[in-house]
């Protein structure tokens, strides 16, 4: 698993109206990103395209959360959850992520993630849950941190 370091501990704020969008191939390589995503993550679109999406993975995120995400979307189901991402400079930002498998002619061809700014109550709940999960004290079935 990729462990992106260093981290600064500084949270990057972004406008509430932003929608951070990426598309990946079936292996998780970024094939498209919008300007808002690139701006918040601190990369240019050219730097992002072709890179594995875990380029922005924050080390505080439990590996099990991403295992659940991949298991869900590979089955053709959508996934939603709170995600703490790492910026290029080590800062972080929280997103309420909705990941959807894209089908063409009945075949899974790519994934798209649309993210928006979560409520602070969602972030607090996710921080507590993920910290407990990283300590090994949260059951695998606990993933619903959205509402």
Where are these regions (language model features)?
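Alpha-helical transmembrane segments and their helix-membrane boundary motifs
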Residues: 142-147
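Sensory/regulatory domains in signal-transduction proteins
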Residues: 3, 10-132
